[in-house]
Structures are given as C-alpha cells and as structure tokens.
Amino acid sequence: METHRLKSIIILTLLLMNVFLLGTLGIRQAQQAAARRQATEELVKLFAAEGVTLSEAAVTFDPPPQALTLERDSGAEKTAAAVFLGDELTAADEGGGILTYTSALGRAVFRASGAFEIVGELGKAPADLVRRFCRSYECESPDEWLDASGSGSVTVNRLCRGYPVEGGTVTFLSENNVLRSVSGTFLPLHSTAAQGEGLLTASTALTSFLEARRTSGAVVSAVKGLSPCYELQNTASTLTLTPLWRVDTDAVDYYVNCVTGAVDHA
C-alpha cells in the first residue's frame, strides 16, 4: 500500500514539474514575441523618421547563414561534365588552374575561379536535362524557356544551402531541341563553415543600411523586403561565400555584408 502511495506521489510530482516547465516555456515565448514586436515597431519608427517606409514583414529575427569556404573539387567537376558529355572523358590540365574534359559529344572547361563552360551536342530533351542538373547542383529551377522548335536560352541563379548566391548564375542554350551549351559558376557540393559568430543580425543590417542611405543621400522611400543571401568571392584556389542581407527597396537593391557591415547596391 505504501509503495503504491509513493509511486502516486512521484507521478504527481513529475506531472507538476512538467506543467511548471511548460508554463515557464510559454512565458518565455510570450516575452520573446513581445520583445520582437517592440523591436519591429521601433525600427519602423526609426525609418519613418528618415522618410522611409519599412514594411513590418521585412523585419526578420532569423540568423544569417554562415560564411563558407569551398575547396575546389576536380572530381565533382568531372562528374558534372559527364552529365552532358558521357562517362568516356579525356581529362587534361591546361595550367593556370584550367582543367578540361572532352568526349565525342563536346568539351568542358573548368577554371579555379569557379567559372565553367560545356559546349557540344549535350543531349536531347533539354528542358529535362536542365531540370535534373538544377536539382542536383543547387540552381533555381527555370520556368518555361523553350519555343516551339525547342530553341531558347535561360539563366538561373546558383544556390548554396538554399540561399541565393549573388554573382553566381548558370546559362543554358538550346537549338532545335538539342542542348548546346551550359556555362556559368560551378560551386563544389561540399563546404566548410568559416565563421559563425559576430555576424550582423537583420535589425543591425537595416540600421546600417539606413545610415548608409543618410550619408550617401540615396533616394529611397520604401524598404519592401529583407532576405539572406551569399556573395561569391574567389582566390587562386579557394572560393568563399560571404553572407549578406539583401535589402529590397523601391529604387535598387542594397546588400549589407554580414561580416564587415559594408553597404553596397546592385
């Protein structure tokens, strides 16, 4: 009997602890939501004082992406070339960071800067080929881009971990339902986080943008959106993706560097 009572007391105690923890969590979430609402209202007022309308929907409290370092991967480049040129490839090192792959179907050139170009008869059903490539190599999926003859060209943005890469695109060209060329920026699939602390939050990026606008005298009357993205930078052997906040305005788009705080426009 005493054992049964003891078990009941323990169960009741655990239930009360769970209720307490849930209540504490609910209070914290409510406090956080209230603090975010207040911060948003203050930002809107700050912009209004400068004659700029800031959409509340543009204010986000999500963290920016991490800075990334991408090491060149010649194996991944060869695999990408094989998508269009087949597996029977002849590889050559042309020097200066240039690697080439050739087959009976065409030729692929990859550079240390991340630039690449593949030309030849790269396959029929170009729309399907392009969709598969974009799915495998993190590119935005294009809308309809071919005319009735199966000809046309389209340029899509590169992505990394789901974020757009400014300065990174891939262009596809088709003639008479045959894909003829693929060119643009090739990003290795594997990356290393280079920096994860001290990056500018969205609210800090917005205030940095507002200060830069005031200093430059730029004519901007409304901020319509704010979104994270990457900027592609390259050296002789390393590609770097620097996180940015993109500020969409009624004039031009601006970019705030999450590492340095520098503000630039498109």
Predicted feature descriptions by range:
Residues 1-144:
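Preferential activation on post-signal-peptide N-terminal prodomains/segments
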Residues 10, 14-17, 170, 179-182, ...:
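Generic hydrophobic secondary-structure signal
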